[in-house]
UniProtKB/Swiss-Prot annotation:
Gene Ontology biological process terms from the UniProt entry: actin filament organization; auditory receptor cell development; auditory receptor cell stereocilium organization; cell motility; equilibrioception; neuromuscular process controlling balance; photoreceptor cell maintenance; positive regulation of lamellipodium assembly
Gene Ontology CC entries for this record: basal part of cell; lamellipodium; microtubule cytoskeleton; microvillus; plasma membrane; stereocilium; trans-Golgi network transport vesicle
Role description: May have a role in the excitatory ribbon synapse junctions between hair cells and cochlear ganglion cells and presumably also in analogous synapses within the retina.
Membrane-spanning intervals of the chain: 8-28, 101-121, 135-155, 186-206
Cellular localisation: Cell membrane
Name listed for the protein in its UniProt record: Clarin-1
Membrane topology note: Multi-pass membrane protein
Annotated family: Belongs to the clarin family.
InterPro entries in UniProt: Clarin
Tagged with keyword Nucleotide-binding: no
Glycan-carrying positions: N48, N184
């Protein structure tokens, strides 16, 4: 492939990586990962509410990795509330999973910025054949994509398996018990998903630029060596 086309492809991949890094940084700091609807189970059972009557006992919340806000309703009007995961909810949430989500998000940002630098260096500089060259591009794209995948899996498990929304809704609520009615992943979660997809796309762009996948190259070399041994 002509060098000019390679420059265009690498520049495109570098710009996509840079936009991903900015997107993930913004996503980590915003409370737009999950939007949930919560039902005041205690109040609804006391009055035997059904149908439209349940609307008086429906609240909602939205939250991210660090903080969130919502409204509780238990038949006596709306009660707005705000919360922070650290230090407010440390005793109520699976802390190890939550910290790992934040950690992998930070690693994702750092590696995505490294990938941006590598792509631009390959477009305009004279890369080495090892770390700064195609091997480094494939490696950074693969690890970054893996981090993005881990962030989504860990966060989904925290929300669904560990019932994060219910734990938040019932935090410091001694009288009323709340149950999650509906949960939807919102903007920030899908930004991480797009970033994961972009790293997969970058791998295809590297291949489109004319560089073989690392494992394919090693297999071809191994086949050649075996053939040479048989000849001699």
């Amino acid at each position: 492939m002509p060098s000019q086309q390679k420059k265009i492809i690498f520049c495109m991949a570098g710009v996509l990586s840079f936009l991903c890094a900015l997107g993930v940084v913004t996503a980590v700091g915003t409370p737009l990962w999950v939007k949930a609807t919560i039902l005041c189970k205690t109040g609804a059972l006391l009055v035997n509410a059904s149908g439209k009557e349940l609307d008086k006992f429906m609240g909602e919340m939205q939250y991210g990795l660090f903080h969130g806000e919502g409204v509780r309703q238990c038949g006596l009007g709306a009660r707005p509330f705000r919360f922070s995961f650290f230090p407010d909810l440390v005793q109520a949430i699976p802390v190890s999973i939550h910290i790992n989500i934040i950690l992998f998000s930070m690693i994702l940002v750092v590696l995505t910025m490294v990938g941006t630098a590598f792509f631009m260096y390959n477009a305009f500089g004279k890369p080495f054949e090892t770390l700064h060259g195609p091997l480094g591009l494939y490696l950074v794209s693969f690890i970054s994509g893996s981090c993005g995948c881990l962030v989504m899996i860990l966060f989904a498990s925290e929300v669904k398996v560990h019932r994060l929304s219910e734990k938040i809704a019932n935090f410091k609520e001694g009288t009323y018990a709340y149950r999650t009615q509906n949960e939807n992943y919102t903007t920030s979660f899908w930004v991480v998903f797009i970033c994961f997809f972009v790293h997969f796309l970058n791998g295809l762009l590297i291949r489109l630029a004319g560089f073989q996948f690392p494992f394919t190259k090693s297999k071809e070399t191994e086949t050649t060596n075996v053939a040479s041994d048989l000849m001699y």
